[in-house]
Amino acid sequence: RQMCIRDSGPGMQLNDGRVISNFIVQALRGEDITIYGDGSQTRSFCFVSDLVEGVVAMMESSADFVGPVNLGNPGEYSIGEIAETIIRLCGAQSRLSYLPLPEDDPRQRQPDITLAREHLGWQPRIALEDGLRETIDYFRGVLGLS
């Protein structure tokens, strides 16, 4: 009865192909950050500890309702904003490099967490920048840059 949307945080793989890990690894290595499209497409990211709390709330819930319950963060950021924030938080000199947007890439991804709020009393608590800082620290360790 649940669905986790766009998780991020420590434990991500270096080469998993996801936006957050790709951008952080590129910035920490001093590489330019690759953006597909013009960077205006939006995404929502939920820190892993928030998702774990949501899963636990779902398992412990005795609420009787129908639906999948979206666990995610409704805060929406453009890909360009995320890249610039990661560059700043990493203290990197990376620049943005733009490539064509794949045809099947959606312009927007944002979860509706209404059921999670109403039936589980759950919503994410970790702000994007706080989660990014922790994830950057994790990747510094993975890359041996600590």
Language-model-detected regions and their locations in the chain:
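Single conserved hydrophobic/aromatic residue that forms the stacking wall/gate
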Residues: 1-5
